[in-house]
Regions:
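Non-heme Fe(II)/2-oxoglutarate
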Residues: 1-87
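Catalytic core of non-heme Fe(II) oxygenases with the double-stranded beta-helix
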Residues: 65-140
Length: 140
């Protein structure tokens, strides 16, 4: 089985703008998210804005929790259609992170459970190549 799969254009540009504007208007953001918990005080310069929407069954924003639960259903259906494979039903957490070109994300595993899946989405409605940025999955 592959380590990662790619699904493009799950939501259209209009919907992306709607959820993007909703997200940036939500007051639940914190500015101290890190990819790895550490006691190193200097690591705080690598923090980025983040929001916990849902964690271990606890919803912190009912609207966004419902939105991302529904979006996950759409992704799972598209995944089944494209790859003929069922993703697990349970969702352990929905966390959001806002990154920019200076954000440093260290290599990490989202979960220790080898059966767990991560759905990583990009919700930037307008993107230009000069903005930079990339995602590195297992060195690829």
């Amino acid at each position: 089985m592959k380590k990662y799969y790619i699904l493009d254009n799950i939501i259209d540009k209009t919907e992306t703008f709607k959820i993007y504007n909703n997200l940036i208007s939500t007051p639940s953001w914190t500015l101290n998210r890190l990819t790895d918990d550490t006691n190193d005080l200097e690591s705080s310069i690598n923090c980025f804005p983040g929001m916990v929407v849902e964690d271990k069954g606890q919803s912190y924003n009912t609207y966004l929790s419902g939105y991302f639960q529904f979006l996950t259903t759409i992704i799972k259906n598209e995944f089944k259609k494209q790859y003929n494979f069922d993703l697990p039903e349970n969702i352990l957490r929905i966390h959001l992170g806002a990154k920019n070109h200076k954000s440093e994300t260290l290599f990490h595993a989202d979960m220790e459970d080898s059966r767990a899946w991560t759905i990583l989405g990009f919700l930037t409605p307008v993107w230009k190549a000069e903005y930079g940025g990339n995602i590195n999955l297992e060195g690829e």
